[in-house]
Structure formats: C-alpha cells, structure tokens
Amino acid sequence: MIAIIDYGMGNIRSVEQALKYIGAAYIVTSDKEEIFRSDGVILPGVGAFPKAMDILEEKDLVRVLQEIGCSRKPLLGICLGMQLLFEKSEELQDCNGLSLLPGVIRKLKVPYKIPHMGWNELKKEGEIALWNGVEDSSFVYYVHSYYADCPNEIVYGISDYGVKVPGFVAKGNIYGAQFHPEKSGDIGMQMLKNFKGVVETWKSSQLSI
C-alpha cells in the first residue's frame, strides 16, 4: 500500500489517477498511523515552500516524513514535494525543509519564461531502479519556478532551462522528481511503475524478517 500524503497542497487527484492506472494499491491520507503502516510514501505538492512546511508542522507530519526518510521505506517527492526533501529554500524567505537530502532550493534566474512550464528533455545521469524501461533524453512535464542546488552525486536526471535543472534526484530510499511523472505520459507511468516495484521489493523484505 502506497500512502499519498494529503496536506492540502498536493496534486492529489492526478497522482491518485496515475496509481490507479498502473494498478498500485494506495491510500490518500494525512493520518500518521496509516502513513507508518504503508509500504511506500508519495509526497506531492504544488504551491509555496514555506506554507507547505507550516502545514506539515501543524499536522505533525514533519517528524513522520523524517522518520520515513531515515528508514528504508521508499519515499517519492513530486514537484514541491521533491523540494521539501531538501535542507532549506529561499522561496519568499529562508525556510528549513525536511533535510532528508543535501541542498538548497533556489529561484530560477534564466532568460526564459518563469515558471518553467511544459515539456523538456530529461538526460539520465547514472542508473537507478526507477530508470528501468525509461529511455535517455525522454521528455517530461514541468511546472516550477525554483530548482534544487544540490550535490552531483544525488542527481540522476537533468534538464536544461538556461541552468542545469536537477529533474530527478535520489539517495538510498529517497527519490525526488522536479517534473510531474503523473503528467508525463508513458514515461511518467513507467517511472511510477518502477517506484511501485521498489515498494513491493521493500514490502517483501519486511515480510521475510
């Protein structure tokens, strides 16, 4: 069972429909016990970083997500949800994030239209489980005005928008997509299927303990 975190700022409906399409068992929840009982977690998000962190704090979900991140349970952040995984953001004000990944969220300063909205090429950097069946230089769908300034060793996918945008990051059980896999057609569905596979593998490992 995959828990989609509902904290009032997520693209819940599209993520829910995508998981339904790939046949993944899921629950939309903000209940701490349901999140801990899940086999994997998706943190979606659309909106401002400081507001999102305030809401997560109010719902006591910061601690929950940090505990999930520090375990081996698979965690996938999408768009703003990916940004929240980092140490802090410069959006509106300096604001601390979940600190599950090293790096700072900075505003895009490019000679192009902001937000970066639409399809862009994603170049793979290295290999991870979520790349299975995903061709290099596939096109994915973005909507964002901020990007992650982070170490190269956690970057597994890059798009060019006047600056190198980390499109996909990963460290251990933690994954983050700056783009929207649920809106990225067959490529996005394949990545979500791969995440489902990672979740199932983790679940099987727990049953054997």
UniProtKB/Swiss-Prot annotation:
One GO location term (cellular component): cytoplasm
Keyword hit for Lyase: yes
Coiled coil: none
Main subcellular location of this protein, as a coarse class: cytoplasm
Single GO MF descriptor: imidazoleglycerol-phosphate synthase activity
Record-annotated active site: 79, 180, 182
InterPro entries, per the entry: Class_I_gatase-like, GATASE, Imidazole-glycPsynth_HisH
Glutamine amidotransferase type-1 domain residues: 1-205
Compartment(s): Cytoplasm
Gene Ontology biological process terms, A to Z: L-histidine biosynthetic process
Catalysis: reaction(s): 5-[(5-phospho-1-deoxy-D-ribulos-1-ylimino)methylamino]-1-(5-phospho-beta-D-ribosyl)imidazole-4-carboxamide + L-glutamine = D-erythro-1-(imidazol-4-yl)glycerol 3-phosphate + 5-amino-1-(5-phospho-beta-D-ribosyl)imidazole-4-carboxamide + L-glutamate + H(+); L-glutamine + H2O = L-glutamate + NH4(+)
Protein known as: Imidazole glycerol phosphate synthase subunit HisH
Species for this entry: Bacillus thuringiensis subsp. konkukian (strain 97-27)
